[in-house]
């Protein structure tokens, strides 16, 4: 799956789109994707000057975006009518820094799926070395219902 299809699925845009390519997807089971990390990423200006390191929370966000792609493709959802929200992250661990020039591999595996709720395990690696991991809880909602709820509050 190339960047064009990813842009059709996810609402995220620069500088917050953190998935560049999906290389494997088994609907309802697992997904493998990549994020190419370059020195041009805006977060490197302040994290950390002179020693650029990708913020761990953005690695988790990349895994969450990959989870959303897996949910959309598993259920053949229309992304113009649906949104996926991250509900929680458990057991997040950061093992090694991610640096400019790294290719971040994102691996998502479905732990459980019931209705609109997805629980996944996410693993981020660089050159086969584990850099971050966690369990993700996400929900898929109707865009119209979400807009109506926001207007009512």
Curated annotation (Swiss-Prot):
One of its GO terms (cellular component) is cytoplasm. SUPFAM superfamilies: Thioesterase/thiol ester dehydrase-isomerase. It catalyses: a (3R)-hydroxyacyl-[ACP] = a (2E)-enoyl-[ACP] + H2O. The active site is at 47. It is found in: Cytoplasm. GO terms for biological process: fatty acid biosynthetic process; lipid A biosynthetic process. It is an enzyme of class 4 (lyase). It comes from the Bacteria. Keywords: Cytoplasm, Lipid A biosynthesis, Lipid biosynthesis, Lipid metabolism, Lyase. InterPro entries: FabA_FabZ (IPR013114), FabZ (IPR010084), HotDog_dom_sf (IPR029069). Its EC number is 4.2.1.59. One of its GO terms (molecular function) is (3R)-hydroxyacyl-[acyl-carrier-protein] dehydratase activity. Belongs to the thioester dehydratase family. FabZ subfamily. Involved in unsaturated fatty acids biosynthesis. Catalyzes the dehydration of short chain beta-hydroxyacyl-ACPs and long chain saturated and unsaturated beta-hydroxyacyl-ACPs. This is 3-hydroxyacyl-[acyl-carrier-protein] dehydratase FabZ. It comes from Myxococcus xanthus (strain DK1622).
């Amino acid at each position: 799956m190339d960047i064009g299809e990813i842009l059709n699925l996810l609402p995220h845009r620069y500088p917050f789109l953190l998935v560049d390519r999906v290389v494997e997807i088994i609907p309802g089971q697992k997904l493998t994707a990549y994020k190419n990390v370059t020195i041009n990423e805006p977060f490197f200006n302040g994290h950390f000057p002179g020693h650029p390191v990708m913020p761990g929370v953005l690695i988790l966000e990349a895994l969450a975006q990959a989870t959303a792609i897996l949910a959309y493709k598993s259920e053949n959802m229309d992304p113009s009518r649906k949104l996926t929200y991250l509900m929680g992250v458990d057991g997040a661990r950061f093992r090694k820094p991610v640096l400019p020039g790294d290719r971040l591999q994102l691996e998502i595996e479905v732990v459980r799926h019931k209705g609109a709720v997805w629980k996944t395990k996410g693993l981020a690696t660089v050159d086969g070395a584990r850099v971050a991991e966690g369990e993700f809880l996400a929900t898929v909602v109707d865009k119209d219902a979400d807009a109506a709820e926001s207007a009512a509050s």
